[in-house]
Amino acid sequence: MDKFRWHPEFDFSKVRIRYIDRPKGYSEVSGDDIKEIGHMFIYLYSGAAIPHHRIVEIRYGEEVVWRRP
């Protein structure tokens, strides 16, 4: 995630994170929604916090760069 956030060749707004959102099922946020990437949580500008263990997929544009096995 830090690679996409800080490297000048990447546009962080193209990052999409899919995660388990209880009780809804799955939800997705973009890089523009992310305020801070912490040790155990991703903090959003909305005030929500996504635990890292609930992340199931990370995409950059249309490419899946990480998927939970």
Swiss-Prot record:
InterPro entries listed in its UniProt record: MJ1316, UPF0248
Superkingdom of the source species: Archaea
Entries under Pfam families matching the protein: MJ1316
Stretches of the chain forming a coiled coil according to its record: none
Family: Belongs to the UPF0248 family.
UniProt name for this protein: UPF0248 protein AF_0420
Organism: Archaeoglobus fulgidus (strain ATCC 49558 / DSM 4304 / JCM 9628 / NBRC 100126 / VC-16)
